[in-house]
Amino acid sequence: FIKKEKRKEDPYKNIAIEDPKQLALFWQCSEELSPRFPFKAELHQFMLLTAMRKTECLKMEKAHINFEKGTLFIPKGISKTKYRDEELPITPELEVLLRNILDLGNRPDFPFYKMKDFRWLFATRNWGAQKYFNKDFRLSHKARLGGDEKYIPVLRALMREKSGDPDLLYAPKILRKTYITKSQQIFAGRSEITQQMSRHRNIDVLNSHYNKPGIETRREYASEVSKVFSFIQRRTA
């Protein structure tokens, strides 16, 4: 008989950022690290404001943004459930972030980002002059951001330093949980409202099959939650 070792419990399994000051700290540190980790810092910010999964965010395209309609399109092909095409409302805070992301194309090291046929919202850092006119590369999955593994410990360390808490826990997986937790608190546990932004398919049969609010109703829901992120500001040149 071989006794199996107990699996270590994931320290981030039941964690969400509930303290408004810690939320603001996360945003401040992300802004501070953006020049060093462009697109990676914004990826984490985007995850917080949309409650989207990282794998979904990395596949988002600039064309999925419709400022005129105020919607963010999520094709079923990139959704985890792959159930149907979905839309999220663009709140004022999310619009600020999206415009900040698009403004990364103004940086001298990312001239390719504004090219009409460069489709990815989060671009690769692995870019060279030889790839500038390589259309196949620009249109391929290789041109989008691959991951954030090196960024996570740097952001965590900066948050710990600024908070004075050496045990502060941070991982990107808590961002979706944070949005959902905040939504549940604001809407007094009404899961059918939270579900419209978290895009969970199965909370219960009633909510899945009969609760179908339109985009404007969901915009009201999302705007209420988004007021929590009042610290977000447009970047200056």
What are these regions (language model features)?
Residues 1-54, 58:
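Basic, Lys/Arg- and aromatic-enriched nucleic-acid-binding interface segment
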Residues 45, 49, 55-56, 174-201:
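C-terminal catalytic core of tyrosine-transesterase DNA break-rejoin enzymes
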Residues 64-71, 168-169, 188-209, 234:
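Short, polar N-cap/turn motifs at the start of nucleic acid-interacting alpha helices
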Residues 78-80, 198-224:
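Catalytic-site neighborhood detector that most strongly recognizes the C-terminal catalytic loop/helix
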Residues 22-23, 91-167:
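Active-site/catalytic core of tyrosine-dependent DNA strand-transfer enzymes
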Residues 69, 103-108, 115-118, 204-205, ...:
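C-terminal secondary-structure termini that scaffold catalytic or DNA-interacting sites
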Residues 28, 59, 67, 208-212:
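Phosphate-coordinating loops and pocket residues in cytosolic domains that bind phosphorylated ligands
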Residues 3-4, 59-100:
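Conserved tyrosine-mediated DNA breakage-rejoining catalytic core shared by Y-recombinases
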